[in-house]
Amino acid sequence: MKTKKFLESKQKSINWQITLKVLIIGVITIALLVPKFMILDLIGQRQHTAEESSKEVMQSWSLDQTVRGPVLAIPYTERNIDSNGKELNEEKEFYLLPKKLEIEGQVFPEIRKRSIYETVVYESAIKMGGHFDISGFDALKIPPENILWEKAKILVAIHDLRGINDRVEFGWNDSVYAFSPGMENKLVGNNGISLQMPQLLPQDFPAHFQFTLNLKGSESLNFAPLGETTEVTLQSAWNDPGFTGSFLPAEHTINNEGFTASWKVLDFNRNFPQQWKNDEYRVTDADFGVKLVTVADHYQKSSRAAKYGILIILFVFLSFFLNEIITKQKVHPFQYILVGFAVLVFYLLLLSISEQLGFNLAYLISSVSVLIMILLYSRTFLKKWVHAIVQTLILTFSFGFIFVLMQLETYALMVGSIGLFLVLALTMFVTRKINWYGE
């Protein structure tokens, strides 16, 4: 009778110890969230530092570029009668966009480094041509005698004028003119170049134009579809482009040697006409172009990986706890803490090494280093190599599983959900014969 009571008392003690251990593991897991969030904050700080370094390079070189033009701005006189019957003459402007606009660009990328951080900059040769036509001009209902043709201007907006490498000459029919810096009219942009056309006459139309921009910039190059038909072709040796803006290319080719992309945009595809008066429309909302994407996205990947940190810790703690239950080999809470910190140190190694060697190689080096450390350490308290190896293999699977999720963007949720389902099913299978109450 005493023996039975002793066994029951001992079993209750064991049950209480298991419950207490589960609670302790839960508290440790929650406590480890604090350093995990500190690591996420550190990743954000390093990313901010990299972005600031990139901005410094761009400020010294030239910013991202957007080219909008050419636009023909022609003043006219509007006659009004005030309340006293006095005639007032007010000078206003109307705007004509090209009937046809063709753009051919060669982009020559270059990597600039500041400290350990890289920024992509470029030089470009952009040939622009086409023709203007005033066949639809009558819709504006401006009396011909009120038009001040001698004050007409050509406007070309350029986001960062520091990027202009050479003087820009404008071919107009059989004549050549030189652009001047600055642009009073902000219709097409805040910065740009302009050209006075003092000899412009209505009989000059249709008028053909062509000019070349040798332009340097950073990260992206964009254009506005100002032609009734706008055709743009860009070529570059950069093999990782991102197409941005209101329109994607109609055709593009990307390979190891670079990319070629072609756009065709009609006036029907945008929200402004070919001619208008005053400031009725703006042309700044239809830009499109290319971004030279840098593959150094290790901060985003490191951040995503760190967000899975608690999942890996749960996998590891679960495997150690089940090992305790199955083998009766106890693991001290302090040993759980050290193993948890080892997993978190993995993310610090990943962040620091990826800044030098890239994400994939950094992931391999960091995971192997932590796996070896945990293998050798767990051998000291699990007593047998086979148990330590099993725990290390489980952690290896966890690291590998997270790495696969990092490579998958579209299917990451589905693969992650299936993976968790299989882990839960395996845990149920392994623990199906454990008598938790000793009955």
Where in the sequence are the language-model features?
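Cytosolic-side membrane-insertion boundary helix
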Residues: 282-313, 331-333
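Generic detector of multi-pass transmembrane helix bundles and their immediately adjacent loops
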Residues: 310-439
